[in-house]
Swiss-Prot record:
One of its GO terms (molecular function) is carbohydrate derivative binding. It holds the Pfam family PGI. GO terms for biological process: gluconeogenesis; glucose 6-phosphate metabolic process; glycolytic process. InterPro entries: G6P_Isomerase, G6P_Isomerase_C, Phosphoglucose_isomerase_CS, SIS_dom_sf, SIS_PGI_1, SIS_PGI_2. This is Glucose-6-phosphate isomerase. The gene is pgi. Catalyzes the reversible isomerization of glucose-6-phosphate to fructose-6-phosphate.
Length: 550
């Protein structure tokens, strides 16, 4: 069981607090000027495909030593071992946390409640493989005998964001199938998705563990209604719907053949589920062999995380640097900035992964925390972000540590597009780190033929303070295997931070209250009667809605 250790009570935390008093004045320009080996000392590779450069951070070797001590004193190593061994570290739900078992390519036993789960994991993978082959090869026919051309994944949260992110990231590996993802209960989402589809050639994947998720089942019933408006026979549903669920009764009642139900288990958290049956849409999108490559990459990073010394452990290094900014520098957010258009949903995926996992205010002892936990995660692809929010990162008043991610090899090497993209990738971290001094700005004006008197009022606006921290993650190319490793890198970073912050990262009770209130309000919207049972604001909003919808 995870220990209940308040990190602020450790000697390492006290040492870091004292160290920050000296380190807050660190200048990246000085750190690089004083150490020609800084890049070599503060960078690491993973295999031959991933390079992590963390040299442009406001850290010294002393900083890292104290951060590693914090990891030791909060018993991170023991926590890692407990997670991988199947201990029920999700205490509030009495569950193990074993998304690592889903991609356990070594096939070594993983025991939960006395049972090795790997035979079940492998059985579902084999079932996914066979199903994928039938659909992709065209052997599976719809009710009119035509091949499936379009697949619609109906889910929300972890049943949508992960598969959608991966399917978009790996479009270069696309099968002949067209993938669509519906998540929002707003009817516009499914209506627009179905507008151009043919019921005779469309397959729906209904992704809901319980088969009761409000948004997913609302969309599922609308999808079935749309299908039956053409098919006219409930029996045809079985050829056009599959379920990613564990609720056999509800799946069968819906009309889905339970042979086409793909199970997963309570030790698979939603936001960590894309390597489970929830990844069936990924299999159909990129082919089963490429899905296995994704699992391989994730497994290799899992093994690295479980076995590497803390000082060489990439997820741990990223996590500790994040804690340095979050808890000592007072940074409130982190930006994830992929310089690859295929990764356009990567930041959104880990926005969910991080904020739902570590957005907690109660520690493992049930007490309110008196320190900062999870940061706000956000980001967009480069170079779009440069023309949107980089102004604030460069010259704003907030400290925003950034992760820059880019591939050396593009899947679309059109003329000089990729060199221009990469030039921006390299330039941004250099600009953020070193900025531009008043003297440099003045020299540029003089070189352009201006006098200092002419530009003296403009100069302050063109100065860049620099000293803005970044990590650079350079990958060889966005492949299934590399994406799997990158995904696991961030997952295990999140886990590491949760351990150190003494919180439970694998529940999400914060989403429940809104659901409960929505279920109470829904019946109140069925008539035109005025509502008075809530606070004045909610009453006023509901009553205005009722008036306007007439």
């Amino acid at each position: 069981m995870l220990k209940n250790i308040n990190p602020t009570h450790t000697q390492a935390w006290k040492d870091l607090t004292a160290h920050y008093e000296d380190a807050q004045d660190l200048q990246l320009s000085d750190l690089f000027a004083n150490d020609s080996e800084r890049f070599n000392k503060f960078s690491a590779t993973f295999g031959s495909d991933i390079l992590l450069d963390y040299s442009k951070n406001l850290i010294t070797e002393e900083t890292l030593t104290k951060l590693f001590a914090l990891a030791e004193q909060t018993e991170l190593k023991a926590a890692i071992a407990e997670m991988f061994s199947g201990e029920k570290i999700n205490k509030t739900e009495d569950r193990a946390v074993l998304h690592s078992a889903l991609r356990n390519r070594s096939n070594t036993p993983v025991v939960v409640d006395g049972e090795d789960v790997m035979p079940k994991v492998n059985a579902v993978l084999e079932k996914m493989k066979a199903f994928t082959a039938r659909i992709v090869d065209g052997d599976w026919k719809g009710y009119t005998g035509q091949e499936i051309t379009d697949v619609v994944n109906v889910g929300i949260g972890g049943s949508d964001l992960g598969p959608y992110m991966v399917s978009e990231a790996l479009v270069p590996y696309k099968t002949r199938l067209n993938m669509h993802f519906v998540s929002n209960v707003d009817g516009t989402h499914i209506a627009e998705t179905l507008k151009d589809l043919n019921p005779e050639t469309t397959l729906f994947l209904i992704a809901s563990k319980t088969f009761t998720t409000q948004e997913t089942m609302t969309n599922a019933h609308s999808a079935r209604d749309w299908f039956l408006a053409t098919a006219q026979d409930q029996a045809h549903v079985a050829k056009h719907f599959a379920a990613l669920s564990t609720n056999v009764g509800s799946v069968s009642e819906f009309g889905i053949d339970t042979d086409n139900m793909f199970e997963f288990w309570d030790w698979v958290g939603g936001r960590y589920s894309l390597c489970s049956a929830i990844g069936l849409s990924i299999c159909l999108s990129i082919g089963f062999d490429n899905f296995v490559e994704l699992l391989d990459g994730a497994h290799e990073m899992d093994q690295h995380f479980a076995q590497a010394p803390l000082e060489e452990n990439l997820p741990v290094i990223l996590a500790l640097i994040g804690i340095w900014y979050n808890n000592f520098h007072g940074a409130e957010s982190e930006a994830i900035l992929p310089y690859d258009q295929y990764l356009h949903r990567f930041a959104a995926y880990f926005q969910q992964g991080n904020m739902e996992s570590n957005g907690k205010c109660v520690d493992r002892g049930g007490n309110p925390v008196d320190y900062q936990t999870g940061p706000i995660i956000w980001g967009e692809p480069g170079t779009n972000g440069q023309h949107a929010f980089y102004q604030l990162i460069h010259q704003g008043t907030k400290l925003i540590p950034c992760d820059f991610i880019a591939p050396s090899i593009s899947h679309n090497p059109l003329t000089d597009h990729h060199p221009k993209l990469m030039a921006n990738f390299f330039a941004q971290t250099e600009a953020l780190a070193f900025g531009k001094t008043k003297e440099q700005v003045e020299a540029e004006f003089v070189a352009a033929g201006k006098t200092l008197d002419e530009v003296k009022d403009l100069v302050p606006f063109k100065v860049f303070d620099g000293n803005r921290p970044t990590n650079s993650i350079l990958i060889k190319q966005v492949t299934p295997k590399v994406l799997g490793s990158l995904m696991a890198l961030y997952e295990q970073k999140i886990f590491t931070q949760g351990v150190i912050w003494n919180i439970f990262s694998f529940d999400q009770w914060g989403v429940e209250l809104g659901k409960q209130l929505a279920n109470q309000i829904l019946p109140e919207l069925n008539d035109a009667d005025s509502i008075a049972g809530h606070d004045s604001s909610t009453n006023g909003l509901i009553n205005a809605y009722k008036q306007w919808r007439k």
